[in-house]
Curated annotation (Swiss-Prot):
This is Putative pre-16S rRNA nuclease. The lineage of its organism: Bacteria, Pseudomonadati, Pseudomonadota, Alphaproteobacteria, Hyphomicrobiales. Belongs to the YqgF nuclease family. The keyword Hydrolase applies. GO terms for molecular function: nuclease activity. Could be a nuclease involved in processing of the 5'-end of pre-16S rRNA. GO terms for cellular component: cytosol. Keywords: Cytoplasm, Hydrolase, Nuclease, Ribosome biogenesis. NCBIfam families: RNAse_H_YqgF. One of its GO terms (biological process) is rRNA 5'-end processing. HAMAP family: Nuclease_YqgF (MF_00651).
Length: 163
């Protein structure tokens, strides 16, 4: 059965209580990949995937998910600052729909506004050269996106347990 592509909170209802999540920062040339621990506390980088074809990209992402026994995916959705969705967001949604046809793992969409800007500032602060930043920025953006989603899910879990 194909997976669902949903906003993060709705997708979380489809995920088991435990299990790693795979975070993705989708670019036109690369895909940054991060993964969480099974308790969903910490995101760590996995790789920056050089995009080839959708079939090849999806096969690699599904292999990573399988290797990590992932419970689902978190895909950064590039929403404009005014809240609208432009061509990049539409392309991301299309990628998510196509990936969902190949897996039963629910895909959660998470607002990634300013993630690359924040990561670039952090890497500049670490005095990393432009060439080195270019090699790691997408993977670090995937970490940033996934960690933001994990933090939001943790707040929701604490809130629901308190009620």
């Amino acid at each position: 059965m194909p997976a669902s592509v949903l906003p993060l909170i709705e997708a979380a209802a489809h995920w088991p209580e435990r299990g790693a999540l795979v975070g993705l920062d989708l670019g036109t040339k690369t895909i940054g990949v991060a993964v969480s621990d099974p308790d969903r506390r910490l995101a760590t980088g996995v790789e920056t995937l050089q995009r080839k074809t959708f079939t090849a990209d999806a096969a690699r992402l599904l292999a990573i998910a399988g290797e990590r026994n992932a419970a689902g995916f978190v895909l950064g959705l590039p929403i404009n600052m005014d809240g609208s969705e432009g061509p990049r967001a539409q392309s991301t949604r299309a990628f998510a729909r196509n990936l969902a046809r190949l897996t039963d793992l629910a895909i959660g969409l998470w607002d990634e506004r300013l993630s690359t800007v924040a990561v670039e500032r952090e890497l500049i602060g670490m005095d990393m050269s432009r060439a080195k930043r270019a090699k790691v920025i997408d993977e670090h953006a995937a970490i940033f996106i996934l960690q933001g989603a994990l933090d939001r899910l943790a707040v929701l879990r604490r809130t629901s347990k308190a009620n």
